[in-house]
Amino acid sequence: MDRGEKIQLKRVFGYWWGTSFLLINIIGAGIFVSPKGVLAYSCMNVGVSLCVWAGCAILAMTSTLCSAEISISFPCSGAQYYFLKRYFGSTVAFLNLWTSLFLGSGVVAGQALLLAEYSIQPFFPSCSVPKLPKKCLALAMLWIVGILTSRGVKEVTWLQIASSVLKVSILSFISLTGVVFLIRGKKENVERFQNAFDAELPDISHLIQAIFQGYFAYSGGACFTLIAGELKKPRTTIPKCIFTALPLVTVVYLLVNISYLTVLTPREILSSDAVAITWADRAFPSLAWIMPFAISTSLFSNLLISIFKSSRPIYLASQEGQLPLLFNTLNSHSSPFTAVLLLVTLGSLAIILTSLIDLINYIFFTGSLWSILLMIGILRRRYQEPNLSIPYKVFLSFPLATIVIDVGLVVIPLVKSPNVHYVYVLLLVLSGLLFYIPLIHFKIRLAWFEKMTCYLQLLFNICLPDVSEE
């Protein structure tokens, strides 16, 4: 390996990259596929549903700014892991990492399958996509993206920016089309907005459900806790990215929903499995076949950044001694190749074994549990270290509001649809102790793994990073 240049994760990403990264991470497939949860729990009241979308943006801003405090205070790739380790101990931090291994692999597997389904769907217009070609294409896309991610930040940068431009362009096209339909003033297009609040008003329980549905659509703002170590001037870059991306997402979400409601009736939206395709079929019948390809192309960016960001905590945990030294290595492109390889391998297994995907659906609620711990950590730090110099602070009401929302995201699924799978998920999280106690607490070393580490270093041309000057 050429050692003319230092091998380490470098701070090479600036404001524009960070903004596009946050945009992609928040805007997922939901706005294209099924943005109907808010409308359903708003009792198909158009005015209430749009108000919920706007209100959820404010709630999302509070939680995102809380995550920004963690990212700025600990500007390293995997700040969430380091924060948990500092304020709750190494055991909790390891269990968070253990959970994220399964959650991260499940996310990339689900995104790869969704990407494959939308890519193949136009070739099967009258039936569902066969499982075998869908899985084969998903595996191919997953490994292609993994290889591109391992090639370093240059490949990631141009692919991410191109994909984000495409995604925003598609949503802008949908939004502008809705505006044009409204300006034309046809009765069937404007009547739903002239009497937006005339429908039945939702009761408090349905309204809370609608808020949780909308809040989930804005999730993803905590992504800077995973890649802060590669941002230039994170203290100023992160807040600027947040205050650019989140208002833009809010406007886009509102305009896209208005466009859907302009072209389709609320009942048509609720009955559709892919609202964007139904919308295209109604607004531009001759171009409807393009929408699945456009959606799949935009979903490519989500898969790209999911692999990119989920590999960073693995790398940091290895630096902290909670994972084998093998995962603390970088290739000649200064990319954590072995961390990416582990994530892609686990994602491939999740694609092949579809029952694992079902289990991953129940793991998602653990993300809210970890978010609650992070918010408690912020409050704990303010109480235990009141004189600590913190470069960026949020109002205490922000973490408290985030705790309330996250508690609801944990409790409501348990109350609404109790399932034994949640017990399995808890056991899966706690099973991390079977590895933590012997290998980390008692520091048992496996000689054969150390030999394999040396062999893999030669095979993949990887090495330990140089000492950072920070």
Curated annotation (Swiss-Prot):
<dbReference type="InterPro" id="IPR002293">
    <property type="entry name" value="AA/rel_permease1"/>
</dbReference>
<comment type="function">
    <text>Associates with SLC3A1/rBAT to form a functional heterodimeric complex that transports anionic and neutral amino acids across the apical plasma membrane of renal epithelium. Preferentially mediates exchange transport, but can also operate via facilitated diffusion. May act as a major transporter for L-cystine in late proximal tubules, ensuring its reabsorption from the luminal fluid in exchange for cytosolic L-glutamate or L-aspartate.</text>
</comment>
<keyword id="KW-0472">Membrane</keyword>
<dbReference type="GO" id="GO:0046982">
    <property type="term" value="F:protein heterodimerization activity"/>
</dbReference>
<dbReference type="InterPro" id="IPR050598">
    <property type="entry name" value="AminoAcid_Transporter"/>
</dbReference>
<feature type="topological domain" description="Extracellular">
    <location>
        <begin position="184"/>
        <end position="206"/>
    </location>
</feature>
<keyword id="KW-0050">Antiport</keyword>
<dbReference type="GO" id="GO:0016324">
    <property type="term" value="C:apical plasma membrane"/>
</dbReference>
<feature type="transmembrane region" description="Helical; Name=11">
    <location>
        <begin position="394"/>
        <end position="414"/>
    </location>
</feature>
<dbReference type="GO" id="GO:0003333">
    <property type="term" value="P:amino acid transmembrane transport"/>
</dbReference>
<feature type="transmembrane region" description="Helical; Name=10">
    <location>
        <begin position="359"/>
        <end position="379"/>
    </location>
</feature>
<dbReference type="GO" id="GO:0015810">
    <property type="term" value="P:aspartate transmembrane transport"/>
</dbReference>
<feature type="transmembrane region" description="Helical; Name=4">
    <location>
        <begin position="129"/>
        <end position="149"/>
    </location>
</feature>
<feature type="topological domain" description="Extracellular">
    <location>
        <begin position="262"/>
        <end position="287"/>
    </location>
</feature>
<protein>
    <recommendedName>
        <fullName>Solute carrier family 7 member 13</fullName>
    </recommendedName>
</protein>
<feature type="transmembrane region" description="Helical; Name=9">
    <location>
        <begin position="337"/>
        <end position="357"/>
    </location>
</feature>
<feature type="topological domain" description="Cytoplasmic">
    <location>
        <begin position="443"/>
        <end position="470"/>
    </location>
</feature>
<feature type="transmembrane region" description="Helical; Name=2">
    <location>
        <begin position="46"/>
        <end position="66"/>
    </location>
</feature>
<dbReference type="GO" id="GO:0015811">
    <property type="term" value="P:L-cystine transport"/>
</dbReference>
<feature type="topological domain" description="Cytoplasmic">
    <location>
        <begin position="150"/>
        <end position="162"/>
    </location>
</feature>
<feature type="topological domain" description="Extracellular">
    <location>
        <begin position="33"/>
        <end position="45"/>
    </location>
</feature>
<dbReference type="GO" id="GO:0015813">
    <property type="term" value="P:L-glutamate transmembrane transport"/>
</dbReference>
<dbReference type="GO" id="GO:0015179">
    <property type="term" value="F:L-amino acid transmembrane transporter activity"/>
</dbReference>
<comment type="subunit">
    <text>Disulfide-linked heterodimer composed of the catalytic light subunit SLC7A13 and the heavy subunit SLC3A1.</text>
</comment>
<dbReference type="GO" id="GO:0015297">
    <property type="term" value="F:antiporter activity"/>
</dbReference>
<feature type="transmembrane region" description="Helical; Name=1">
    <location>
        <begin position="12"/>
        <end position="32"/>
    </location>
</feature>
<feature type="topological domain" description="Extracellular">
    <location>
        <begin position="415"/>
        <end position="421"/>
    </location>
</feature>
<keyword id="KW-1133">Transmembrane helix</keyword>
<feature type="topological domain" description="Extracellular">
    <location>
        <position position="358"/>
    </location>
</feature>
<keyword id="KW-1003">Cell membrane</keyword>
<feature type="transmembrane region" description="Helical; Name=5">
    <location>
        <begin position="163"/>
        <end position="183"/>
    </location>
</feature>
<feature type="topological domain" description="Cytoplasmic">
    <location>
        <begin position="309"/>
        <end position="336"/>
    </location>
</feature>
<keyword id="KW-0029">Amino-acid transport</keyword>
<keyword id="KW-0813">Transport</keyword>
<dbReference type="Pfam" id="PF13520">
    <property type="entry name" value="AA_permease_2"/>
</dbReference>
<feature type="topological domain" description="Cytoplasmic">
    <location>
        <begin position="1"/>
        <end position="11"/>
    </location>
</feature>
<feature type="transmembrane region" description="Helical; Name=7">
    <location>
        <begin position="241"/>
        <end position="261"/>
    </location>
</feature>
<feature type="topological domain" description="Cytoplasmic">
    <location>
        <begin position="380"/>
        <end position="393"/>
    </location>
</feature>
<feature type="transmembrane region" description="Helical; Name=6">
    <location>
        <begin position="207"/>
        <end position="227"/>
    </location>
</feature>
<feature type="transmembrane region" description="Helical; Name=3">
    <location>
        <begin position="88"/>
        <end position="108"/>
    </location>
</feature>
<feature type="transmembrane region" description="Helical; Name=8">
    <location>
        <begin position="288"/>
        <end position="308"/>
    </location>
</feature>
<keyword id="KW-1015">Disulfide bond</keyword>
